[in-house]
Every structure is written in structure tokens, then in C-alpha cells.
């Protein structure tokens, strides 16, 4: 059961908090055999320089090893529990295969404890089942989509997201993404049936800066508040508007300027996003 709770304004830090509580989530520790140490990099590379801004601090986390390939074919897996994962917006499910192996998978919406999932070439069209796109009927809602066969899911993995299979053309399937983009994907690529879980994730409000810091997210300082040495918008006597069109700290236009490079996979885009 999902509970959306707005905190009472007992303090400035509680006034804007909106929390989403799922009573079906496992409250204990993760399965020990499927976690590994996640070392905090604080946005630095191997030379110690900041390569990703606004990262650092936060609570220690363990990385949950999630199975994105779903390559254990024709063996039924029973859902043992649904868990919170600090490394992604979606929930994850711990599944136990009939041969005794356990794996984490991204939990789709509607998947509950004691339900079963299976992957393979020709399996039932049911929530949580994984199969090649060639065997999925048109109009089906899918997630966890591979971009290359056997590489593992790379698209549609965030909370509440989904794509729709709208066509099949020779060796390719045509899928419609949430952005409105229509894209061709090889029919041998796999996908999972259903919508990704935790669709209420966007309703959550952290309410205070400290909650961001717990997650390892540091403040974003405006360029106009910096010195000229630090940002193209910096400097000036008194408050200024920057004096030029908005740019990044490296002088590249921002606020709507498209920076996506042309890739070889561009030819697979049938219709650009809206």
C-alpha cells in the first residue's frame, strides 16, 4: 500500500516535506550476496580534480547488483520481497530461481511478494516477464529495453517510466518513448513487460537542503554570485544580470541550447522527441 504524507509545519525544515511510504517494501538489510562496496568519489577523477560538480558527502551506500540481462531462460523465479534501492529511483525485487540462485531485478508496477516471473524466447505476456521484442505483441507497454542484443537493458529503467511497442519492420521493432521519440531497436533485443515501479517518486519533496546533502548532492552556486576567475557571469560592482546570454562555466550556451552530439545510433531514430 502506498501512503503519500505531507508533514505538518512544525519547523521550517518540515514545512514542505512530502514523503511517499510503501508499506510493502522490505524493512531489513539487503541480501548480502548481491551487494558490493560503493566507494564515494565526491565527483573527483583519479587525479583528484572535480569532473562532476555538486557531488560529495552523503550517507554511505552499498551498490545492489541488479540483473539487467535477464538471461536465465525458462526457469521460474519467485519474488521473495520488494526492496528500496538508494542507487535508483525504482524499487528492486529479490527473486529466487527454481535452481536456488537469487538475483535482484528492477521491480515493475504490480509485482508483489510470492508472484512468479520468467524470461525466455516464448513466455507468457505477463508483468515482469522478459522476452525478445519479436515475440511481444504490438501495443504492449514495456520497460528495461536492450539497445544491443545480450548487452543488458539500457533504456526505460527509471521509476514510473515505460515505452510502447508500436511496430515491427524487417529486423527492427519500433518503440515510442515517453519523450515522444520513436526509435528502432533490433527485434532480438529483450524487454520486460509492464511499467517500472514507484511511479509516485515524482510526488516526493525533500523539504530542506539537508535532505539533499544526505543523498550526496552539494549546493549549486549561481555564476553571477562568483568572481570573474570562476565563471563567465562572475564579477561586477553590486548585483549584475551577467551581462551576456546564459552560459555554462566553460562558456557554452545553456538554457535550451542543444549539445547532443551526432551518434551512429541517430539513424535508428524514426521521429525526434517533442
Swiss-Prot record:
One of its GO terms (biological process) is cytoplasmic translation. Coiled coil: none annotated. Residues 224-274 are annotated as: Disordered. Residues 257-274 have a biased composition (Basic residues). It comes from the Bacteria. Part of the 50S ribosomal subunit. Forms a bridge to the 30S subunit in the 70S ribosome. This is Large ribosomal subunit protein uL2. It comes from Francisella tularensis subsp. holarctica (strain LVS). The lineage of its organism: Bacteria, Pseudomonadati, Pseudomonadota, Gammaproteobacteria, Thiotrichales. The gene is rplB.
